[in-house]
Amino acid sequence: MANRIKNTPRDLPPLSRLEQRVMGIVWNLGECGSSEVIEEFNRTERLAESTIRTVLANLRKKGYVELVPTIARQHRFRPAVSRENVGKRTLRDLVSGFFGGSPRQVLSCLIKEERLSDEDLEALRKLIEEQQGKGK
């Protein structure tokens, strides 16, 4: 089966926190039924099955998931957009909305507020060095 994941979520409406959590489960599972999403969600937090089914229906309406053709009566879902591209768009929205468009402010906040390991800091240094030559 061909990869049907769309490359860009630019025209899709933003996700609520609950939709983000459910979408994370769908991305992790790949193709899945609502019962699998419910089971996975309830490992960390209890939520009514009907609520999760409603969230899945809303994600479908928004274009984040699509139905998988099946002969069974149960709906099966798969991601319609990639996690990476939704993450990039979400980060761009965060940078422009909360940090005045400044990546420097985002990185400053991240470094000051999070406990970054030496390994994480070294990886950030390498990324910065790579970008310095590109003029970005």
Task: Label every model-predicted segment.
Residues 25-33:
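Short capping segments at the starts of secondary-structure elements
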Residues 86-134:
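Amphipathic alpha-helical dimerization/coiled-coil segments
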Residues 1-23, 134:
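Short alpha-helical segments that sit at the start of domains
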Residues 32-40:
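Short acidic, hydrophobic short linear motifs in intrinsically disordered regions
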Residues 14-18, 70-89:
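Short, cationic-aromatic polyanion-contact patches
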Residues 63:
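Glycine-centered, phosphate/nucleic-acid-interacting loop/turn motifs that mediate DNA/RNA or nucleotide
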Residues 53-57:
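Short, hydrophobic-biased segments on the C-terminal half of alpha helices
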Residues 39-49:
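Short helix-coil junctions and helix-kink-helix linkers
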